[in-house]
């Protein structure tokens, strides 16, 4: 009976340890989900026609094109938010999932995003560098995140992918933001 009691205590101890471990893991998982929340509420949400209007104005705009289901967008978001606060501007946010990519407005916008960029594409294990316009990559590939600076009625700069806060702020400073 002593061996049976000892086994029962060991089994109960292991079960208790397992329960504690599961609770800690669950709490960490919830904390990570909250930490990675896709919160664009401090940005001004715009539609395609609004972006076209930015090209008709003389102002300077930081346009962020992203989507909640993009992990790299989640990575870039804290830098966008912090830079916006530090540099006192409002990011214009276009959610690519809300865009009718068959509309004439979209076709107009794709044409306005005429600055060329080079990106590495990996298709079926083969990588190649492709150079084309931002409009092309957004329209045909749906690449996000994308940050574009519009100033004086034209696209003056842009990038795809994520950047650190320091790198992003340096990039903005190059264009007077």
Regions found by a protein language model. Give the residues of each.
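Solvent-exposed loop/turn segments at secondary-structure junctions
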Residues: 68-72, 97-100, 154-156, 163-165
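Extended, charge-rich low-complexity interaction segments
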Residues: 116-152
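Core hydrophobic alpha-helical transmembrane segments of single-pass membrane proteins
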Residues: 11-19
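Local sequence-structure signature of Cys/Sec-based thiol-disulfide redox active-site neighborhoods
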Residues: 52-94
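N-terminal leader/targeting and pre-domain segments
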Residues: 3-12, 24-58, 167-177
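Non-catalytic, surface beta->alpha helical segment in thiol-disulfide oxidoreductase systems
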Residues: 138-177
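Thiol-based oxidoreductase modules, predominantly thioredoxin-like and allied folds used
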Residues: 88-128
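Extracytoplasmic/periplasmic, Sec-exported soluble proteins
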Residues: 43, 68-75, 139, 160
């Amino acid at each position: 009976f002593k061996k049976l009691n000892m086994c029962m205590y060991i089994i109960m101890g292991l079960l208790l340890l397992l329960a504690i471990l599961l609770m800690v893991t669950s709490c960490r998982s919830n904390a990570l989900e909250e930490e990675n929340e896709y919160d664009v509420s401090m940005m001004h949400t715009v539609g395609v026609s609004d972006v076209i209007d930015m090209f008709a104005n003389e102002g300077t705009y930081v346009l962020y094109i992203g989507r909640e289901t993009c992990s790299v967008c989640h990575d870039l978001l804290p830098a966008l938010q912090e830079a916006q606060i530090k540099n006192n501007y409002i990011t214009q946010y276009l959610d690519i999932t809300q865009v009718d990519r068959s509309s004439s407005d979209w076709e107009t916008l794709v044409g306005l995003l005429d600055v060329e960029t080079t990106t590495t594409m990996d298709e079926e294990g083969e990588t190649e560098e492709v150079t084309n316009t931002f409009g092309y990559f957004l329209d045909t590939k749906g690449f996000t995140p994308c940050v574009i600076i519009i100033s004086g009625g034209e696209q003056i700069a842009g990038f795809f992918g994520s950047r650190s806060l320091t790198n992003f702020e340096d990039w903005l400073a190059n264009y007077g933001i």
